[in-house]
Amino acid sequence: MQMYLVSSLLVALLSTAFESSIDRAFTAANMNDWQDAASALDEAFTQDPQTFDANNLHYLRGRIAENQTEWLRAREEFNKIGADNPLHSLAVWHALRASVQLHDEASAAQFLGALPREFPAELKMRIAREAGPPLTVKIYEDLSTREARLEQAKLQNDIRSMRDLFREKKDDDVALEAARLFSPHVLTPLDQIDVAQVFAAHRQFEQALPFYEKASADPAHAAVARYETARVYFWLQDYKSAVEMYRAIAKDFQGTNWQKDAEYQIALVYWKMADYHNSETAFLDYIRKYGPAGNKEAAIRNLVDVYRVLGEYRKGVETIDRALLTPLSPVTRQVLLFTKAKILYSEDRYAAASAIFQQLRQMKLRSAAGAATAEEAAYFQALSQSKLGNQAAAEAIWRKLALDEFSYYGQRAAEKLGRTETVVTSTAACLPAENLTVAVEADLASLRHPLRSEISRSSDLVSELVFLRLWDEAAFWMERLGATRIPPRGAAGIAYLAGRYNRSIFYADRLPKTGATLPLLYPAGYGQTICDAAMAQNVDPVWLHAIIWQESRYNPNARSGAAARGLMQFIPETAQAVAASAGMSEVTLDKLYDPAISIQLGAKYWSTLLDQLNSPEMALAAYNGGPDNVEKWRSKALDPELFVADIGFTETKKYVLAVFAVRAAYASLLK
């Protein structure tokens, strides 16, 4: 009996020591202290080899060795994961990577052959980028992704395949690189147009221009090539050349849609040049000439804006009133009514303006450039009533709007009611998020299995990775395997701990908005980098978080249709200009995907815009829509109250409203 008690006590002590070593390993790994993590795991293996093996801790030991660049030890540990283990295919991939780092080509080829054919292409591509030519070629041959096809075409100098790639799709990075490599081999006018379109899609306008010009010499492609040439001049802000080209197109292609479209563009270019009288004449000529057969409704809207900039409000109202007597689409009718109300408000005709704002509130409002939102119509009706001295009526509307503390007009209404915003200091915004990390890990405890004495054959890959707290791989495979067994709350937590903040936002957006879930929906990702950049530029880091959230949802690999890249979504020419002003080295397209560089550029640009415009609304509009457009929008009315309502791009207006809402959410979390 005494011997049994001694034996039981020894087992308990060993078990306690083992668990203590494992806890130390997890803590050290979480702090990136790889040496201490490795030491703790080695102790645990000595204390209880069977339990160590049963809980897949050899896999964790291999990952630790990888971080120490101890590739031989890493491969040894991954080789201990058996074929019937749910982590086997991952272990094979890691052993393959270790073999590549060790320049052991024979072993690497063997491990590559052992990978399942359906193993994720992006992980195979990572090996290809690190491996030597024989293995690289083999990987590319077995993959059909655009990235693999491009790399294979580069290795084989396969010009035809490069052309196929950018003809299939023009707006991704593969297309741009393929077009660059193909451009010296352009053979036909169609090739020239295709290459030019790729460069233009990526805002490489100076590279696009010579290809369009060459293609325009071919009669079969002259119209499209010359029209696109004019567009390139426009984007390069060479407005004089753009007008000349559009005029030549209108003359040489009379009676066609090319003429009609060119004449509309001429009016827009004059507007962009601030040559408002010529713009007025061009829009009037266009409307008279083409009527409903042309882009009449848009021309009328633009013509009214010209009158507003010129201060010719009477002409603007008369143009609107005439148009309202004709058949119009519902959205154009709403836009014109809203514009008329803003003109009347600018003329201090508050009663007439209020009546139209009330009329708009009773409509089913649609989203469009220049259209009102329901909140906007209510806010301006209240503003009109306030100007008329009907303060009670105004405050009743503002109180309703202020119930939504996150919305832009809710915030403005609260200001009108005398409520002051709680200021969040930069220090508060820069506090470390360790408490949140601990809370999220605790929340995931139910997904982690307890220590076991033998491997469970029913376990799945993601569960094993969650137990090992390998959040990066758990987040990756959770989505690849469609791990529906993990609820959105757990999935958001795993993604957050993995630093995949865009996926944390994706899952948290499905959850009730509570104190526990809001930090997952509005993560303070890249916190220290953002705080350092904010302090260097003397800007509020909360604004930077809000801009990143709206621009990319914290996805460092985000790319927009307008060729903007990275966390803070810079287009190439803006990035180069900001980098030069900040004294940074040349920023290549690849560098725009680097979070640190994107944040550094974003903080500098945001600081510059705030200094220039002295208004967060205008600075946000400039960030999204361009500073030159902000000048056009602000010139429509002297009253700054009207600026957001006068933003001419639907996307930019939504952007400004959204960033204010997101900033309020971040501020509420930091109170």
Task: Give the location of each predicted region.
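Alpha-helical segment of the N-proximal tetratricopeptide repeat
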Residues: 20-43, 47, 67, 148-152, ...
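"A position-specific structural signal for the A-helix of alpha-solenoid helical repeats
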Residues: 23, 60, 94, 126, ...
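Short solvent-exposed coil/turn linkers within tandem alpha-helical repeat scaffolds
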Residues: 45-54, 78-90, 112-128, 140-145, ...
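Catalytic glycan-binding domains that act on GlcNAc-containing polysaccharides
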Residues: 237, 276, 301, 310-315, ...
